[in-house]
Amino acid sequence: MSTTPIRRSASRRRTGFAVLLGLTLVAAVVLVIARGADGATATAPVSGYVPPVKHVFVINIENKGYDSTWGPSSAAPYLAKTLRSKGVLLNTYYGTAHNSQPNYVAQLSGQGPNPQMQGDCQVYSTFVGATTAAPGQAVGSGCVFPASVGSLPTQLQAKGLSWKGYMEDIGTPCRHPAVDAVDPTQKAKVGDQYATRHNPFMYFSAITHSADCARRNVDLSQLPKDLASASTTPNLSYITPNLCDDGHDSPCVDGRPGGLASVNAWLQVWVPKILNSPAYKSDGELVITADEADSPQSDSTACCGEGPAPNSSLPGITGSGGGRIGALVLSRWTAPNSWSTTPYNHYSLLASLEDIFRLPYLGYAQTIGLNRFGLDVYNNGWNS
């Protein structure tokens, strides 16, 4: 008996399945795409898709609420208009705490705040605590976590992936105060506007005690050299401007205006270097956000079910979070001039980065139901 009809039947089944799968994916995209009143494309949350990103760049600006950064009268038009037109704006993205320091720590570890962290760690104090609470929270007080507390950088290293923190004005690599001493970088100085509290790597003993900390936590001036090729660009590049260029100070100690005007000028210099790099062009993603809204008094709102933490009943001091700040994601997998209304926060960002690098979730990134970037963010080129 001829077997040709059997082969044809199998082929038809495979073809039918492929067509059905394609229609399902197309239908999913159709369902998530809508047209906003301002002409931008809005997307609703869809989970389960992670593009083949291999190089991620994260930039934080300081203490800027959503309206001041992204609104029509923004003093940073390069960010709010030029760059915004190139990617997807997450317009319900929130900080997780007040003041600055715990937001940076949240992005790298999923750890919630405690009172010392909420006070920006005026003393570079040892974290003291012997217990944990779900989800993955170290219970105690202080700022510098023991080696037992995990972080995204240590996860990456364990998997053979690379990372670097690029800190403007750090000068000496891996620079931090003496343990349990007052932090002398709380206020900018002429010629040195580095702030330890904006360098979250320095709050994990597993990093600061590592033999290669000085190779991985470096001055921003090293970034152009590392961007020269994809092979020399870390899988994670975490970039922190100084206290003037991140918009924290206004005016700045060197006479510049500070605020969003200085943010705008800094981004115009550094973002093109990233966007034109081989790593970004090949498989890169750039995330630009703020650490928190302007102040605990102006906005301490939260999203994503954030509530009391084991070490702080009010992570935002006057409320549950760090306020609405927004975030911009640029990538070949993000559609220009698009936006997402899905609620996200810094724990969502951590979980999304762990998705990209196929890592287990840390701390509050484990939260059940926490939104992670999906087709609402990666809304372009998913079928290419």
Predicted regions and their residues:
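Secretory targeting and sorting signals
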Residues: S2, R7-A40
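N-terminal pro-sequences and low-complexity stem/linker regions of secreted or lumenal proteins
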Residues: G39-S384
